[in-house]
């Protein structure tokens, strides 16, 4: 048997916590495709099985799960047992989010990391800290699906939407093409009705400025389509008049939107897209034209 991994030996601290008989992985007599683990990880999992078997919730058990997570952050059984330890010994919870902060950058797109944060936050209730943490993560990757999902989960569970408009303003100021920020803005303003310090008129002015600044930004046009769906065409008349005045008549994103905004003219607009504006995709626009006037 290989000598025990030095880091693992220090974590297990047999002098302090007593002996522990490892339980090796049982792959059967003739495994078809045995996975080749590192020695430290294989030994760690053997001791982890032993700790689970005896239902040990000690500090060494917690540290062992940390060792295993650093070697395999997707091992949901280890994460689940780590939470059992924390739930059993609440005094360990105080440092858990700090530990998660340290590993977040390395494993920022790992599902288990974010699910574990949700479970810890359900115990600590300190959601303000986590909202600030997500902002720091956006500085690393402002389009990280996992971070956005976690932030939405926080909003839904703690019902504090007061920072969201400011957050999307800041992110779109840095990157007007940030589709994640546009999606989040639409969600909090038009899907939740939780943000009170805004008006549709102000939002349409904001949107007008963003579209005129970057007329080919599909994210902003998609946002406008959502506003049309939620508010109806009559609320957008002034905005559309302004866009028509300031954008070329054959501007492709404008024409695509006008086909939805003015259904009675959609057949003509799609024909214009097919024949003049976007000839390489003429087949699509011809089909859209036929579909608009069955």
Swiss-Prot record:
Catalyzes the transfer of a farnesyl or geranyl-geranyl moiety from farnesyl or geranyl-geranyl diphosphate to a cysteine at the fourth position from the C-terminus of several proteins having the C-terminal sequence Cys-aliphatic-aliphatic-X. The alpha(cwp1) subunit is thought to participate in a stable complex with the substrate. The beta(cpp1 or cwg2) subunits bind the peptide substrate. Belongs to the protein prenyltransferase subunit alpha family. InterPro entries: Prenyl_trans_a. Heterodimer of an alpha(cwp1) and a beta(cpp1 or cwg2) subunit. Its EC number is 2.5.1.58, 2.5.1.59. GO terms for molecular function: CAAX-protein geranylgeranyltransferase activity; protein farnesyltransferase activity; Rab geranylgeranyltransferase activity. This is Protein farnesyltransferase/geranylgeranyltransferase type-1 subunit alpha. GO terms for biological process: peptide pheromone maturation; protein farnesylation; protein geranylgeranylation; protein localization to plasma membrane. Its cofactor is Mg(2+). Keywords: Magnesium, Prenyltransferase, Repeat, Transferase. GO terms for cellular component: CAAX-protein geranylgeranyltransferase complex; cytoplasm; nucleus; protein farnesyltransferase complex. It catalyses: L-cysteinyl-[protein] + (2E,6E)-farnesyl diphosphate = S-(2E,6E)-farnesyl-L-cysteinyl-[protein] + diphosphate; geranylgeranyl diphosphate + L-cysteinyl-[protein] = S-geranylgeranyl-L-cysteinyl-[protein] + diphosphate. It holds the Pfam family PPTA. PFTA repeats lie at residues 57-91, 92-125, 126-160, 161-194, 199-233.
């Amino acid at each position: 048997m290989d000598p025990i991994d030095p880091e693992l030996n220090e974590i297990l601290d047999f002098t302090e916590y007593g002996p522990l008989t490892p339980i090796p992985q049982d792959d059967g007599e003739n495994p078809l495709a045995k996975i080749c683990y590192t020695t430290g990880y294989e030994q760690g999992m053997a001791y982890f099985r032993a700790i689970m078997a005896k239902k040990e919730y000690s500090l060494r058990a917690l540290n062992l799960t940390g060792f295993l997570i650093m070697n395999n952050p997707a091992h949901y059984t280890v994460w689940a047992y780590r939470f059992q330890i924390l739930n059993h010994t609440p005094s360990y919870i105080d440092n858990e989010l700090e530990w998660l902060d340290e590993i977040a950058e390395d494993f920022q797109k790992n599902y288990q990391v974010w699910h574990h944060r949700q479970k810890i936050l359900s115990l600590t209730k300190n959601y303000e800290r986590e909202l600030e943490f997500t902002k720091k993560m956006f500085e690393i990757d402002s389009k990280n699906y996992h971070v956005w999902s976690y932030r939405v989960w926080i909003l839904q569970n703690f019902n504090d939407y007061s920072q969201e408009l400011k957050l999307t303003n800041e992110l779109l100021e840095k990157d007007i093409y940030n589709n994640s920020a546009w999606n989040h803005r639409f969600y909090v303003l038009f899907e939740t009705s939780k943000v009170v310090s805004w008006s549709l008129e102000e939002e349409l002015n904001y949107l007008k400025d963003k579209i005129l600044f970057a007329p080919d930004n599909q994210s902003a046009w998609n946002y406008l389509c959502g506003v049309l769906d939620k508010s109806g065409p009559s609320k957008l008349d002034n905005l559309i008049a302004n866009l028509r005045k300031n954008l070329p008549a054959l501007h492709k994103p404008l024409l695509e939107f006008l086909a939805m905004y003015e259904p009675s003219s959609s057949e003509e607009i799609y024909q214009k897209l097919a024949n003049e504006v976007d000839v390489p995709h003429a087949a699509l626009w011809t089909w859209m034209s036929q579909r608009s006037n069955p």
